[in-house]
Amino acid sequence: MGDCTRGLVRLSEERKVKLLKRVLGGFFNKGSEYLFQCPKCDHHKRKLSINLDKEAFKCWVCDWSGRNIYRIIRQFGTTDDKYEWKSFNQQIEIEKFADKLFGPKENERQAEISLPNAFISLANKNLPTTSIYPLNYLKSRRIGKKDIIKWKIGYCPKGKYGGRVIIPSFDDKGEINFFVTRSYDRNWKKYMNPEVSKDIIFNHPYIDFDEDLVLVEGVFDAIKAGDNSVPLLGSTLTEHSKLFGEIIKNDTPIYLALDPDAIKKTNKLISLFLKYDVETHLIEVSPFNDVGEMKKTEFLERKKSALFLSSDNYLVNRISKM
């Protein structure tokens, strides 16, 4: 490495340390290791170790760790701090790598889809008398007007999807890419969805991958989970899924809140996320059958107390349940 290159590396490191100090406060320096107070557990001693050479961090008290220092900036820094850190090469390279590994496949086209002809938006002011039935159903699930407007919920009084609430999804271009239907009468088939690929990001335009993302089973769970929640629609998330690609590309922190009876699926997702060093938290859903049964306030409280997962504590937890 030439003198010029070494000088640039030192300058880059100095800029990073200066930014970290602005976000975290004072520090001790031990070679390439910098010790700060941990903003996660707020321990009074400087136990958060940050290694700029390895682009890694770990708190020796609460076990918070990761292989992307930008996580710290994203969670505790300002908008300007985030922008400045992203100007450093590491974050750019991560995004390029993710684009290459998880980017769109050639000739990949999403099947065209549109809402049913009989669809009526429940967000309208003047509604027909038939709207009383889907509105009563939504009310029974504690879903009010704000949710109806936000999720653009409607219904079909007749036709193929007659007697069903309709919740549409939009892709990143604002086009409909899926919709979920749920019967509000006594139809034996509760859900009847279009026969198109579920490899989508439900309501992509409303998801901020730079913030915590909640993964739930169904769309009614997502409504209760609030902002930045994505339903998996009963599908299994894989390394080739569009949603997974965006999570890796943006190094998005994940909060898992799947149904309690989906233990195998939850464990599979946890293993997958930990394999890619995704910051993962587990939300306790029991004794409820799903998030959709909770009040929004209940879910938020549970999210606050979610279990942070690392390879170590996840393995110990699994062994203890054997």
Which ranges hold each PLM region?
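Terminal peptide-recognition signature
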Residues: C38, C59, L138, I167, ...
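Short Cys/His-based metal-binding microdomains
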Residues: L48-Y83
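Acidic beta-strand-to-loop metal/phosphate-binding motif
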Residues: L215, D251-K265, I283-E284
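Phosphate-handling DNA/RNA-contact segment within nucleic-acid enzymes
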Residues: K16, P157-T252, K268
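TOPRIM metal-binding catalytic domain and adjacent DNA-binding surface shared by DnaG-type primases
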Residues: M1-D42, F76-I166, F170-K173, D208, ...
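Short Cys/His-rich metal-coordination motifs, predominantly Zn2+-binding knuckles/fingers
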Residues: C41-H44, C62
